[in-house]
């Protein structure tokens, strides 16, 4: 009986409640590290639409030309300055050189449109000679380009949105390059003074619509191999001058190749030997008719690509709202910590869902840093933080909601009358996930091999053991190899596997100045959802009384 009673007592002890002291250890936390947390939301009543007229025009990725017109923003046109520079650091045209032809070629990169029905419209491409080189102060995308008004091409080149851009220069323009001397090649400044380059653009559309055409510009690429080795491959982005000259008393045909817009004079042969690619930067400019839209936003916030209008949130507005709330809660902006801050910019889903491609993929908050010679836009979100919103579009919630936590922390600690407070204004720029593809040459060759094997195997099954064709061409001809090459699906699968290993694609977030964008967000005076600032902040607890 005593054992039974003891067992009951033991079980009761096991299931009994244990008191928990929530304050245990609290006395050991430093008093200056105790905080009260608060959340607040504010309507942003002051948002401006401003043109980003200080974007750099230089691009190392693509040549961009074209024009698009719409009913809201008007005409948005693009043009590109390209300098044609010899691939060698020495030239020899022989005696009495005679011009034959001068050809330009650039592979298609991509296109951008306002209406997908205009992806393949025909556009006339205008090519003019520069009358003077770009100046040292020509940096921004709205720079004035000084060029002639006479075409320098044979006929009128046409872009269709799918093919490479190819044309021939007129003899009057091309033969000028036959006057090139060794002294002209001593540096780029000397060279461009004599051969400043060309300007490419398209005709403006008569009505709404149009297209931006983007073309590649790099002449060399680094190709990696699975073994770890690499080599340099030449692309089809170049110009080539054909001529006839007298060499050692005999007239011969010859040619000179040019590449596009290097930053310095280089001998490409020497770069290939050390497996390096040259730095190339074309000068892409844009023109907008939307500057009349600049001003304080009402019920709509308009966003245009390129250097067109973008939303700007004044730092003074953020400081006024947040600091007033902190003081209201009994805190001091100097000692308050911002745990999280987000700007939400809502939009209405378009009635035609197919037009969502016009909206930026990323609307990134930045600040504008100006000096006497340069203007830089610095991103405010932390790209290395996976849980931080970079400003990606949310099609489900219909908003952009980038995190600006660290920036708001800086803003609230500035004095309200600080003359440099406007330097903390938030400029929203359009970003794009640029993809870079590297090729493994060995895997690509293996993929091509298996593809040919699958091709042959397919026809072997159709034509039997004697291959295909009247003479038994292909693998398995005459029946000798039929048993080994009759499984089309195995070879096709192996080809696809090898092909997947042949290329590696990486993505990086970059400023997008080239593509067309047109977005309408809800403004401060819109009915219903409006732009809002959401903040979570922590105020230090007061010291205990003595």
Predicted stretch roles:
Residues 4-7, 11-13, 17-546:
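Secreted, disulfide-rich extracellular signaling modules
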């Amino acid at each position: 009986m005593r054992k039974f009673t003891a067992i009951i007592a033991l079980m009761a002890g096991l299931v009994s409640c244990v008191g928990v002291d929530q304050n245990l250890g609290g006395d050991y936390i430093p008093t200056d590290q105790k905080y009260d947390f608060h959340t607040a939301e504010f309507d942003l009543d002051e948002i401006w639409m401003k043109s980003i007229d200080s974007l750099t025009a230089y691009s190392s990725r693509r040549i961009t030309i074209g024009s698009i017109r719409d009913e809201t923003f008007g005409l948005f046109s693009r043009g590109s300055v390209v300098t044609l520079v010899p691939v060698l650091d020495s030239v020899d045209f022989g005696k009495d050189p005679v011009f034959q032809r001068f050809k330009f070629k650039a592979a298609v990169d991509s296109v951008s449109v306002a209406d997908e029905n205009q992806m393949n419209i025909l556009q006339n491409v205008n090519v003019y000679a520069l009358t003077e080189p770009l100046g040292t102060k020509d940096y921004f995308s709205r720079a004035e380009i000084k060029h002639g008004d006479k075409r320098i091409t044979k006929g009128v080149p046409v872009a269709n949105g799918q093919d490479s851009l190819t044309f021939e220069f007129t003899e009057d323009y091309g033969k000028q390059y036959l006057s090139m001397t060794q002294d002209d090649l001593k540096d780029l400044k000397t060279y461009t003074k004599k051969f400043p380059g060309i300007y490419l653009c398209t005709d403006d559309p008569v009505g709404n619509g149009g297209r931006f055409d983007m073309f590649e510009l790099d002449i060399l690429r680094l190709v990696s191999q699975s073994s770890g080795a690499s080599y340099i491959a030449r692309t089809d982005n170049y110009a080539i001058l054909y001529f006839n000259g007298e060499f050692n008393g005999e007239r011969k045909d010859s040619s000179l190749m040019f590449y596009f817009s290097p930053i310095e004079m280089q001998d490409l042969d020497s770069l290939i030997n050390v497996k390096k690619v040259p730095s190339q930067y074309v000068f892409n400019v844009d023109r907008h008719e939307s500057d009349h839209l600049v001003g304080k936003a009402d019920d709509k916030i308009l966003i245009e690509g390129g250097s067109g209008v973008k939303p700007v949130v004044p730092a003074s507005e953020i400081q006024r709202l947040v600091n007033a709330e902190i003081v209201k809660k009994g805190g001091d902006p100097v000692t308050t910590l911002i745990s999280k801050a987000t700007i939400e910019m809502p939009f209405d889903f378009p009635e035609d869902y197919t037009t969502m491609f016009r909206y930026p993929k990323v609307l990134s908050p930045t600040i504008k840093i100006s000096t006497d010679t340069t203007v830089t836009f610095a991103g405010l979100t932390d790209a290395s933080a996976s849980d931080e919103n970079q400003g990606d579009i949310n099609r489900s919630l219909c908003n952009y909601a980038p995190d600006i936590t660290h920036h708001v922390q800086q803003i609230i600690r500035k004095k309200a009358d600080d003359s440099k407070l406007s330097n903390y204004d938030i400029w929203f720029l359009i970003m794009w996930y640029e993809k870079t593809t590297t090729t493994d040459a060995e895997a690509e060759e293996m993929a091509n091999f298996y593809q040919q094997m699958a091709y042959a195997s397919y026809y072997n099954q159709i034509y039997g053991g004697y291959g295909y064709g009247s003479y038994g061409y292909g693998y398995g001809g005459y029946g000798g190899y039929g048993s080994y090459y009759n499984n089309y699906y195995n070879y096709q699968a192996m080809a696809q596997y090898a092909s997947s290993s042949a290329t590696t694609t990486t993505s990086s977030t970059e400023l997008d100045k080239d593509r067309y964008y047109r977005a309408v967000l809800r403004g401060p005076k819109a009915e219903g959802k409006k732009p809002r600032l959401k903040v979570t902040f922590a105020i230090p607890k007061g010291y205990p009384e003595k």
